[in-house]
Amino acid sequence: MVNGNLARQEHIELPEIPLVKDDPLKWCSVSLKDIFARGKRLDASSFDVEAKQARSLLKEGKYPLVSLSGTDGLIKDAFYPGRFKRIYCDNNHGVPFYLPSQMTEIYPRAEKHISKLTNCDIDELKLKLKTLLLTRSGTIGTIAYVSQTTEGMVFSDDVIRITFKQEYDLGYVYAFLKSKIGNLLLKTNGYGSVITHLEPEHLSNMRIPNAPAILKQRINDLVVRSYALRDESNELIDEATRLLIEALKLPPLEELKTSTAPVETFSVKISRSDRRFDASYHVPIVNKIIEQLQSQAAEVTTIGDPRISKEVILPGRFKRVYVEEGHGRVLIGGKQINELDPATKKYISVAKYSKKILESLEIHTNTTLITRSGTIGKVAIAPRHWEHWIPSDHIIRVVPASKKIAGYLYIFLASDYGHELITRYTYGSVVDEIDDNHVRNICVPFLKDAAVQANINELALAANQKRYEAYKLEQEALQIMNDDVIHAR
Protein backbone atom coordinates (compact mmCIF):
# COMPACT_ATOMS: atom_id res chain seq x y z
CA MET A 1 0.00 0.00 0.00
CA VAL A 2 1.26 3.43 -0.83
CA ASN A 3 1.89 5.77 2.06
CA GLY A 4 0.19 9.16 2.10
CA ASN A 5 2.05 12.46 2.06
CA LEU A 6 1.37 16.05 3.03
CA ALA A 7 0.70 17.18 -0.53
CA ARG A 8 -1.97 14.57 -0.99
CA GLN A 9 -3.63 15.58 2.28
CA GLU A 10 -4.12 19.17 1.13
CA HIS A 11 -7.76 20.23 1.15
CA ILE A 12 -8.96 22.67 -1.49
CA GLU A 13 -12.04 24.78 -0.87
CA LEU A 14 -14.36 24.32 -3.82
CA PRO A 15 -17.27 26.55 -4.74
CA GLU A 16 -20.47 24.74 -3.94
CA ILE A 17 -22.09 23.25 -7.02
CA PRO A 18 -25.71 22.34 -6.27
CA LEU A 19 -26.55 18.68 -6.66
CA VAL A 20 -29.22 18.26 -9.31
CA LYS A 21 -31.79 16.11 -7.57
CA ASP A 22 -34.95 14.55 -8.89
CA ASP A 23 -37.80 13.20 -6.85
CA PRO A 24 -37.58 9.44 -6.20
CA LEU A 25 -39.71 7.68 -8.79
CA LYS A 26 -40.81 4.41 -7.29
CA TRP A 27 -44.48 4.03 -8.23
CA CYS A 28 -47.13 5.05 -10.72
CA SER A 29 -50.63 4.15 -11.85
CA VAL A 30 -51.11 2.16 -15.07
CA SER A 31 -54.16 2.53 -17.27
CA LEU A 32 -56.12 -0.47 -18.47
CA LYS A 33 -55.25 0.55 -22.03
CA ASP A 34 -51.54 0.28 -21.24
CA ILE A 35 -52.03 -3.13 -19.65
CA PHE A 36 -53.73 -4.50 -22.78
CA ALA A 37 -51.07 -2.89 -24.95
CA ARG A 38 -48.41 -4.73 -22.96
CA GLY A 39 -50.04 -8.12 -23.48
CA LYS A 40 -52.18 -8.03 -20.32
CA ARG A 41 -49.06 -8.14 -18.18
CA LEU A 42 -49.62 -7.11 -14.56
CA ASP A 43 -46.04 -7.37 -13.28
CA ALA A 44 -44.30 -4.06 -12.61
CA SER A 45 -41.23 -5.13 -14.58
CA SER A 46 -43.28 -4.86 -17.79
CA PHE A 47 -43.49 -1.12 -17.23
CA ASP A 48 -40.70 1.30 -16.42
CA VAL A 49 -42.38 2.81 -13.39
CA GLU A 50 -39.93 5.69 -13.19
CA ALA A 51 -40.48 6.64 -16.83
CA LYS A 52 -44.26 6.66 -16.45
CA GLN A 53 -43.98 8.73 -13.30
CA ALA A 54 -41.70 11.15 -15.14
CA ARG A 55 -44.29 11.60 -17.87
CA SER A 56 -46.95 12.29 -15.26
CA LEU A 57 -44.63 14.83 -13.63
CA LEU A 58 -44.29 16.76 -16.90
CA LYS A 59 -48.03 16.67 -17.62
CA GLU A 60 -48.70 18.30 -14.25
CA GLY A 61 -45.94 20.86 -14.72
CA LYS A 62 -46.12 24.61 -15.15
CA TYR A 63 -45.53 24.69 -18.90
CA PRO A 64 -47.49 23.04 -21.73
CA LEU A 65 -45.84 20.14 -23.51
CA VAL A 66 -44.61 20.29 -27.08
CA SER A 67 -43.42 17.52 -29.38
CA LEU A 68 -39.74 17.43 -30.15
CA SER A 69 -40.34 16.57 -33.79
CA GLY A 70 -43.22 17.03 -36.22
CA THR A 71 -45.04 19.94 -37.83
CA ASP A 72 -45.47 21.81 -34.55
CA GLY A 73 -42.28 20.45 -32.98
CA LEU A 74 -39.01 22.14 -32.10
CA ILE A 75 -36.81 20.10 -34.44
CA LYS A 76 -36.11 21.28 -37.97
CA ASP A 77 -34.38 18.10 -39.14
CA ALA A 78 -33.23 14.82 -37.60
CA PHE A 79 -31.36 12.23 -39.63
CA TYR A 80 -28.45 9.85 -39.74
CA PRO A 81 -26.34 9.02 -42.81
CA GLY A 82 -26.97 5.84 -44.72
CA ARG A 83 -25.13 2.73 -43.63
CA PHE A 84 -22.00 1.77 -45.49
CA LYS A 85 -19.24 -0.79 -45.42
CA ARG A 86 -16.19 0.72 -43.78
CA ILE A 87 -12.81 0.29 -45.41
CA TYR A 88 -10.20 1.00 -42.77
CA CYS A 89 -6.68 2.05 -43.66
CA ASP A 90 -3.58 3.59 -42.10
CA ASN A 91 -3.33 7.21 -41.01
CA ASN A 92 -1.54 8.44 -44.14
CA HIS A 93 -4.14 7.27 -46.63
CA GLY A 94 -7.44 7.79 -44.87
CA VAL A 95 -9.88 10.17 -43.27
CA PRO A 96 -9.97 10.38 -39.44
CA PHE A 97 -13.03 8.43 -38.30
CA TYR A 98 -14.72 8.83 -34.92
CA LEU A 99 -16.98 6.41 -33.05
CA PRO A 100 -20.12 7.25 -31.03
CA SER A 101 -18.24 6.44 -27.82
CA GLN A 102 -15.99 9.45 -28.50
CA MET A 103 -18.89 11.86 -28.87
CA THR A 104 -18.72 13.13 -25.29
CA GLU A 105 -14.94 13.48 -25.09
CA ILE A 106 -13.62 16.99 -24.55
CA TYR A 107 -11.08 16.61 -27.35
CA PRO A 108 -11.73 13.48 -29.45
CA ARG A 109 -8.73 11.88 -31.14
CA ALA A 110 -9.31 9.62 -34.14
CA GLU A 111 -8.51 6.00 -33.33
CA LYS A 112 -9.35 4.76 -36.82
CA HIS A 113 -9.20 6.01 -40.39
CA ILE A 114 -11.42 5.09 -43.31
CA SER A 115 -10.27 4.95 -46.90
CA LYS A 116 -11.41 7.60 -49.37
CA LEU A 117 -12.47 4.65 -51.51
CA THR A 118 -15.24 3.86 -49.04
CA ASN A 119 -18.61 3.97 -50.79
CA CYS A 120 -20.20 6.79 -48.79
CA ASP A 121 -20.73 10.53 -48.79
CA ILE A 122 -17.91 11.79 -46.55
CA ASP A 123 -19.39 15.30 -46.45
CA GLU A 124 -22.66 13.89 -45.12
CA LEU A 125 -20.75 12.22 -42.29
CA LYS A 126 -19.02 15.45 -41.25
CA LEU A 127 -20.53 17.25 -38.27
CA LYS A 128 -22.00 20.71 -38.73
CA LEU A 129 -22.09 23.55 -36.21
CA LYS A 130 -25.32 24.18 -34.25
CA THR A 131 -26.19 20.49 -34.33
CA LEU A 132 -27.25 18.21 -31.49
CA LEU A 133 -25.87 14.67 -31.56
CA LEU A 134 -27.70 11.63 -30.26
CA THR A 135 -26.51 8.01 -30.23
CA ARG A 136 -29.08 5.69 -31.78
CA SER A 137 -27.71 2.22 -31.05
CA GLY A 138 -25.57 0.47 -28.47
CA THR A 139 -25.61 2.89 -25.54
CA ILE A 140 -28.53 5.00 -26.75
CA GLY A 141 -29.40 8.45 -25.50
CA THR A 142 -25.89 9.88 -25.20
CA ILE A 143 -26.04 13.62 -25.94
CA ALA A 144 -23.42 15.96 -27.39
CA TYR A 145 -23.24 19.44 -28.88
CA VAL A 146 -21.25 20.21 -32.02
CA SER A 147 -18.78 22.97 -31.23
CA GLN A 148 -15.72 24.29 -33.07
CA THR A 149 -13.68 21.35 -31.81
CA THR A 150 -15.89 18.69 -33.38
CA GLU A 151 -17.04 20.64 -36.44
CA GLY A 152 -16.03 18.78 -39.59
CA MET A 153 -15.18 15.54 -37.80
CA VAL A 154 -16.40 12.37 -39.52
CA PHE A 155 -18.62 10.38 -37.17
CA SER A 156 -20.30 7.07 -37.92
CA ASP A 157 -23.89 6.56 -39.03
CA ASP A 158 -24.76 5.47 -35.48
CA VAL A 159 -25.11 9.15 -34.54
CA ILE A 160 -28.35 11.07 -35.20
CA ARG A 161 -27.81 14.68 -36.27
CA ILE A 162 -30.51 17.14 -35.08
CA THR A 163 -31.05 20.79 -36.01
CA PHE A 164 -33.70 23.15 -34.63
CA LYS A 165 -36.08 25.79 -35.96
CA GLN A 166 -35.07 28.24 -33.23
CA GLU A 167 -31.41 28.56 -32.29
CA TYR A 168 -32.12 28.77 -28.55
CA ASP A 169 -33.89 25.40 -28.63
CA LEU A 170 -30.55 23.68 -29.29
CA GLY A 171 -29.10 24.37 -25.84
CA TYR A 172 -32.53 24.07 -24.22
CA VAL A 173 -33.19 20.57 -25.59
CA TYR A 174 -29.58 19.59 -24.86
CA ALA A 175 -30.09 20.47 -21.19
CA PHE A 176 -33.44 18.68 -21.04
CA LEU A 177 -32.10 15.46 -22.57
CA LYS A 178 -29.05 15.62 -20.26
CA SER A 179 -31.32 15.83 -17.20
CA LYS A 180 -32.33 12.64 -15.42
CA ILE A 181 -35.96 13.02 -16.41
CA GLY A 182 -35.22 13.87 -20.04
CA ASN A 183 -32.70 11.09 -20.56
CA LEU A 184 -35.04 8.57 -18.93
CA LEU A 185 -37.87 9.53 -21.29
CA LEU A 186 -35.55 9.37 -24.28
CA LYS A 187 -34.68 5.75 -23.54
CA THR A 188 -38.25 4.53 -23.02
CA ASN A 189 -41.44 4.53 -25.07
CA GLY A 190 -44.91 5.62 -24.02
CA TYR A 191 -45.52 2.37 -22.15
CA GLY A 192 -42.28 2.66 -20.23
CA SER A 193 -40.52 -0.11 -22.14
CA VAL A 194 -36.79 0.38 -22.68
CA ILE A 195 -35.86 1.23 -26.26
CA THR A 196 -32.91 -0.74 -27.63
CA HIS A 197 -32.60 1.22 -30.87
CA LEU A 198 -33.43 4.87 -31.42
CA GLU A 199 -34.73 6.29 -34.70
CA PRO A 200 -35.49 9.94 -35.59
CA GLU A 201 -39.18 8.98 -35.72
CA HIS A 202 -39.12 8.27 -31.98
CA LEU A 203 -38.54 11.96 -31.31
CA SER A 204 -42.01 12.85 -32.58
CA ASN A 205 -43.50 10.83 -29.71
CA MET A 206 -41.46 12.64 -27.08
CA ARG A 207 -43.06 15.69 -25.49
CA ILE A 208 -41.13 18.18 -23.39
CA PRO A 209 -42.05 21.35 -21.47
CA ASN A 210 -42.32 24.37 -23.77
CA ALA A 211 -40.82 27.07 -21.54
CA PRO A 212 -40.91 30.79 -22.45
CA ALA A 213 -38.34 31.95 -24.99
CA ILE A 214 -36.49 34.07 -22.42
CA LEU A 215 -35.94 31.02 -20.19
CA LYS A 216 -34.90 28.88 -23.15
CA GLN A 217 -32.42 31.56 -24.19
CA ARG A 218 -30.93 31.68 -20.71
CA ILE A 219 -30.34 27.94 -20.65
CA ASN A 220 -29.04 27.94 -24.22
CA ASP A 221 -26.54 30.71 -23.49
CA LEU A 222 -25.08 28.72 -20.58
CA VAL A 223 -24.66 25.61 -22.73
CA VAL A 224 -23.13 27.58 -25.60
CA ARG A 225 -20.67 29.31 -23.27
CA SER A 226 -19.78 25.97 -21.65
CA TYR A 227 -18.80 24.49 -25.02
CA ALA A 228 -16.98 27.68 -26.01
CA LEU A 229 -14.78 27.28 -22.93
CA ARG A 230 -14.05 23.69 -23.91
CA ASP A 231 -13.00 24.89 -27.35
CA GLU A 232 -10.76 27.53 -25.78
CA SER A 233 -9.17 24.91 -23.54
CA ASN A 234 -8.45 22.71 -26.55
CA GLU A 235 -6.81 25.64 -28.34
CA LEU A 236 -4.53 26.16 -25.34
CA ILE A 237 -3.64 22.45 -25.35
CA ASP A 238 -2.80 22.65 -29.06
CA GLU A 239 -0.61 25.71 -28.50
CA ALA A 240 1.23 24.03 -25.61
CA THR A 241 1.81 20.90 -27.69
CA ARG A 242 3.10 22.98 -30.60
CA LEU A 243 5.60 24.75 -28.33
CA LEU A 244 6.78 21.40 -26.96
CA ILE A 245 7.34 19.93 -30.42
CA GLU A 246 9.17 23.05 -31.60
CA ALA A 247 11.42 23.16 -28.54
CA LEU A 248 12.44 19.52 -28.96
CA LYS A 249 12.45 19.68 -32.79
CA LEU A 250 10.39 16.51 -32.92
CA PRO A 251 9.64 15.34 -36.48
CA PRO A 252 6.25 13.82 -37.37
CA LEU A 253 5.94 10.26 -36.15
CA GLU A 254 5.54 8.97 -39.68
CA GLU A 255 9.05 10.18 -40.50
CA LEU A 256 10.40 8.12 -37.61
CA LYS A 257 8.65 4.96 -38.79
CA THR A 258 11.18 3.91 -41.41
CA SER A 259 11.45 0.36 -42.66
CA THR A 260 13.49 -1.18 -45.47
CA ALA A 261 12.11 -4.71 -45.06
CA PRO A 262 8.79 -6.09 -46.34
CA VAL A 263 7.93 -6.93 -42.73
CA GLU A 264 8.81 -5.12 -39.53
CA THR A 265 12.18 -6.50 -38.46
CA PHE A 266 14.94 -5.04 -36.36
CA SER A 267 17.88 -6.14 -34.25
CA VAL A 268 18.50 -5.31 -30.59
CA LYS A 269 21.72 -5.49 -28.62
CA ILE A 270 21.59 -7.75 -25.57
CA SER A 271 22.94 -4.89 -23.47
CA ARG A 272 19.82 -2.87 -24.31
CA SER A 273 17.27 -5.65 -23.92
CA ASP A 274 16.27 -4.74 -20.32
CA ARG A 275 15.42 -8.44 -20.03
CA ARG A 276 12.41 -7.87 -22.27
CA PHE A 277 12.11 -10.24 -25.21
CA ASP A 278 8.79 -9.02 -26.61
CA ALA A 279 9.26 -7.15 -29.88
CA SER A 280 6.81 -4.37 -28.99
CA TYR A 281 9.17 -3.15 -26.27
CA HIS A 282 12.01 -2.65 -28.73
CA VAL A 283 10.28 -0.96 -31.67
CA PRO A 284 12.82 1.39 -33.29
CA ILE A 285 10.53 4.43 -33.14
CA VAL A 286 10.85 4.52 -29.35
CA ASN A 287 14.63 4.62 -29.50
CA LYS A 288 14.49 7.36 -32.14
CA ILE A 289 12.19 9.45 -29.95
CA ILE A 290 14.51 9.03 -26.96
CA GLU A 291 17.56 9.89 -29.09
CA GLN A 292 15.81 13.04 -30.30
CA LEU A 293 14.93 14.03 -26.73
CA GLN A 294 18.51 13.47 -25.59
CA SER A 295 19.88 15.62 -28.41
CA GLN A 296 17.49 18.55 -27.95
CA ALA A 297 16.59 18.61 -24.24
CA ALA A 298 18.64 20.02 -21.39
CA GLU A 299 18.16 16.71 -19.59
CA VAL A 300 16.12 13.56 -20.01
CA THR A 301 14.91 12.04 -16.77
CA THR A 302 12.00 9.76 -15.83
CA ILE A 303 8.60 10.20 -14.21
CA GLY A 304 9.97 8.60 -11.06
CA ASP A 305 12.36 11.54 -10.61
CA PRO A 306 11.22 13.51 -7.50
CA ARG A 307 11.47 16.69 -9.58
CA ILE A 308 8.70 15.27 -11.77
CA SER A 309 6.42 13.38 -9.41
CA LYS A 310 5.81 12.86 -5.72
CA GLU A 311 4.06 9.54 -6.21
CA VAL A 312 3.05 7.11 -8.91
CA ILE A 313 0.09 5.22 -7.52
CA LEU A 314 -1.34 1.94 -8.73
CA PRO A 315 -4.15 1.24 -6.24
CA GLY A 316 -4.91 -2.31 -5.27
CA ARG A 317 -8.23 -3.83 -6.19
CA PHE A 318 -10.93 -2.64 -3.83
CA LYS A 319 -14.44 -3.73 -2.97
CA ARG A 320 -17.08 -1.44 -4.41
CA VAL A 321 -20.31 -0.79 -2.55
CA TYR A 322 -22.48 1.18 -4.94
CA VAL A 323 -24.81 3.83 -3.53
CA GLU A 324 -27.16 6.51 -4.82
CA GLU A 325 -25.94 9.92 -5.97
CA GLY A 326 -25.17 12.18 -3.03
CA HIS A 327 -24.27 9.30 -0.70
CA GLY A 328 -20.76 8.44 -1.88
CA ARG A 329 -17.78 9.36 -4.04
CA VAL A 330 -17.89 9.50 -7.82
CA LEU A 331 -16.31 6.45 -9.48
CA ILE A 332 -15.04 6.74 -13.06
CA GLY A 333 -13.44 4.23 -15.40
CA GLY A 334 -10.77 4.44 -18.07
CA LYS A 335 -13.28 5.05 -20.86
CA GLN A 336 -14.48 8.20 -19.11
CA ILE A 337 -11.28 10.05 -18.23
CA ASN A 338 -11.43 12.20 -21.37
CA GLU A 339 -14.96 13.40 -20.62
CA LEU A 340 -15.81 16.59 -18.76
CA ASP A 341 -18.73 15.12 -16.82
CA PRO A 342 -19.09 11.38 -17.41
CA ALA A 343 -22.75 10.60 -18.06
CA THR A 344 -22.42 7.03 -16.80
CA LYS A 345 -20.50 7.75 -13.61
CA LYS A 346 -21.32 5.66 -10.55
CA TYR A 347 -21.12 6.32 -6.82
CA ILE A 348 -19.43 4.16 -4.21
CA SER A 349 -19.47 4.23 -0.44
CA VAL A 350 -16.16 4.94 1.28
CA ALA A 351 -17.42 4.31 4.81
CA LYS A 352 -15.51 1.04 5.12
CA TYR A 353 -12.20 2.31 3.71
CA SER A 354 -9.35 3.23 6.01
CA LYS A 355 -7.77 6.66 5.65
CA LYS A 356 -4.69 5.13 4.02
CA ILE A 357 -6.73 3.23 1.44
CA LEU A 358 -8.87 6.26 0.67
CA GLU A 359 -5.79 8.44 0.11
CA SER A 360 -4.48 5.95 -2.44
CA LEU A 361 -7.80 5.91 -4.29
CA GLU A 362 -8.99 9.51 -4.47
CA ILE A 363 -7.44 12.05 -6.81
CA HIS A 364 -6.74 15.76 -6.60
CA THR A 365 -6.63 18.66 -9.03
CA ASN A 366 -3.88 18.46 -11.69
CA THR A 367 -3.13 14.78 -11.04
CA THR A 368 -2.18 13.03 -14.28
CA LEU A 369 -4.19 9.88 -15.00
CA ILE A 370 -2.98 7.07 -17.28
CA THR A 371 -5.03 4.04 -18.27
CA ARG A 372 -3.06 0.90 -17.54
CA SER A 373 -5.09 -1.99 -18.99
CA GLY A 374 -7.20 -2.69 -22.03
CA THR A 375 -6.72 0.54 -23.98
CA ILE A 376 -3.35 1.62 -22.61
CA GLY A 377 -1.98 5.13 -22.65
CA LYS A 378 -5.06 7.35 -22.49
CA VAL A 379 -3.91 10.40 -20.54
CA ALA A 380 -5.93 13.05 -18.67
CA ILE A 381 -5.31 15.78 -16.15
CA ALA A 382 -7.83 15.95 -13.31
CA PRO A 383 -9.86 19.18 -13.40
CA ARG A 384 -10.90 20.95 -10.23
CA HIS A 385 -14.37 19.40 -10.03
CA TRP A 386 -12.79 15.92 -9.94
CA GLU A 387 -11.31 16.68 -6.52
CA HIS A 388 -11.76 13.56 -4.32
CA TRP A 389 -13.26 11.53 -7.16
CA ILE A 390 -12.15 7.90 -7.32
CA PRO A 391 -10.90 6.46 -10.64
CA SER A 392 -10.97 2.70 -10.95
CA ASP A 393 -7.95 0.55 -10.21
CA HIS A 394 -7.33 0.37 -13.97
CA ILE A 395 -6.04 3.94 -13.88
CA ILE A 396 -2.57 4.90 -12.61
CA ARG A 397 -2.27 8.22 -10.78
CA VAL A 398 0.82 10.39 -11.21
CA VAL A 399 0.96 13.03 -8.46
CA PRO A 400 3.06 15.93 -9.82
CA ALA A 401 5.99 17.22 -7.78
CA SER A 402 4.48 20.70 -7.89
CA LYS A 403 2.11 22.91 -9.79
CA LYS A 404 5.13 24.14 -11.77
CA ILE A 405 5.51 20.78 -13.51
CA ALA A 406 1.93 19.40 -13.50
CA GLY A 407 0.75 20.95 -16.76
CA TYR A 408 4.02 20.33 -18.63
CA LEU A 409 4.02 16.66 -17.62
CA TYR A 410 0.47 16.24 -18.90
CA ILE A 411 1.23 17.90 -22.24
CA PHE A 412 4.24 15.66 -22.85
CA LEU A 413 2.49 12.41 -21.91
CA ALA A 414 -0.66 13.32 -23.88
CA SER A 415 1.37 13.97 -27.04
CA ASP A 416 1.82 11.31 -29.73
CA TYR A 417 5.44 10.93 -28.61
CA GLY A 418 4.47 10.43 -24.98
CA HIS A 419 1.95 7.82 -26.05
CA GLU A 420 4.66 5.81 -27.80
CA LEU A 421 6.85 5.94 -24.68
CA ILE A 422 3.95 4.74 -22.52
CA THR A 423 2.75 1.90 -24.72
CA ARG A 424 6.23 0.44 -25.24
CA TYR A 425 5.92 -1.15 -21.78
CA THR A 426 2.77 -3.06 -22.71
CA TYR A 427 2.73 -6.71 -21.75
CA GLY A 428 0.10 -9.45 -21.70
CA SER A 429 -1.26 -11.94 -24.20
CA VAL A 430 -5.02 -11.38 -23.86
CA VAL A 431 -5.48 -8.17 -21.86
CA ASP A 432 -2.72 -5.61 -22.28
CA GLU A 433 -1.28 -4.15 -19.06
CA ILE A 434 1.33 -1.78 -17.69
CA ASP A 435 2.11 -1.10 -14.03
CA ASP A 436 3.37 1.72 -11.84
CA ASN A 437 7.02 0.64 -12.17
CA HIS A 438 6.77 1.01 -15.94
CA VAL A 439 5.28 4.49 -15.56
CA ARG A 440 8.12 5.54 -13.24
CA ASN A 441 10.59 4.61 -16.00
CA ILE A 442 8.92 6.64 -18.77
CA CYS A 443 11.29 9.29 -20.13
CA VAL A 444 10.48 12.98 -19.61
CA PRO A 445 12.65 15.82 -20.99
CA PHE A 446 13.54 19.10 -19.31
CA LEU A 447 13.67 21.81 -21.96
CA LYS A 448 16.77 23.94 -22.51
CA ASP A 449 14.63 27.06 -22.38
CA ALA A 450 13.04 27.10 -18.91
CA ALA A 451 10.76 29.97 -19.94
CA VAL A 452 9.24 27.91 -22.75
CA GLN A 453 8.71 24.99 -20.38
CA ALA A 454 7.01 27.30 -17.87
CA ASN A 455 4.81 28.70 -20.64
CA ILE A 456 3.75 25.20 -21.68
CA ASN A 457 2.91 24.42 -18.08
CA GLU A 458 0.81 27.57 -17.64
CA LEU A 459 -1.09 26.96 -20.87
CA ALA A 460 -2.02 23.45 -19.72
CA LEU A 461 -3.16 24.64 -16.29
CA ALA A 462 -5.18 27.45 -17.87
CA ALA A 463 -6.85 24.91 -20.15
CA ASN A 464 -7.69 22.74 -17.15
CA GLN A 465 -9.22 25.73 -15.36
CA LYS A 466 -11.40 26.53 -18.38
CA ARG A 467 -12.73 22.99 -18.33
CA TYR A 468 -13.73 23.41 -14.70
CA GLU A 469 -15.52 26.65 -15.56
CA ALA A 470 -17.25 24.89 -18.48
CA TYR A 471 -18.46 22.21 -16.08
CA LYS A 472 -19.90 24.82 -13.71
CA LEU A 473 -21.82 26.52 -16.52
CA GLU A 474 -23.33 23.25 -17.71
CA GLN A 475 -24.32 22.34 -14.15
CA GLU A 476 -25.98 25.73 -13.80
CA ALA A 477 -27.96 25.10 -16.99
CA LEU A 478 -29.05 21.69 -15.70
CA GLN A 479 -30.03 23.19 -12.35
CA ILE A 480 -32.23 25.81 -14.04
CA MET A 481 -33.78 23.12 -16.24
CA ASN A 482 -34.48 20.98 -13.21
CA ASP A 483 -35.83 23.69 -10.88
CA ASP A 484 -37.45 26.21 -13.23
CA VAL A 485 -38.77 23.92 -15.95
CA ILE A 486 -39.18 20.26 -15.01
CA HIS A 487 -40.25 20.74 -11.38
CA ALA A 488 -41.81 24.19 -11.81
CA ARG A 489 -45.41 24.46 -10.61
Regions found by a protein language model. Give the residues of each.
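Well-ordered mid-protein domain cores that form the structural environment of catalytic cofactors
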Residues: 103, 121, 133-143, 174-188, ...
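Non-catalytic DNA-recognition/assembly elements of restriction-modification systems
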Residues: 1-84, 212-318, 450-489
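Short, surface-exposed loop/turn microsegments at beta-strand edges and helix-strand junctions
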Residues: 87-95, 104-107, 111-113, 125-127, ...
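A short beta-sheet element
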Residues: 135-175, 333, 360, 371-412
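Sequence-specific dsDNA recognition surfaces
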Residues: 65-86, 101-129, 304-319, 335-365
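A short glycine-rich beta-alpha junction/loop motif
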Residues: 153-160, 192-214, 389-396, 427-452
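Short hydrophobic-aromatic micro-motifs
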Residues: 96-99, 132-135, 330-333, 369-371
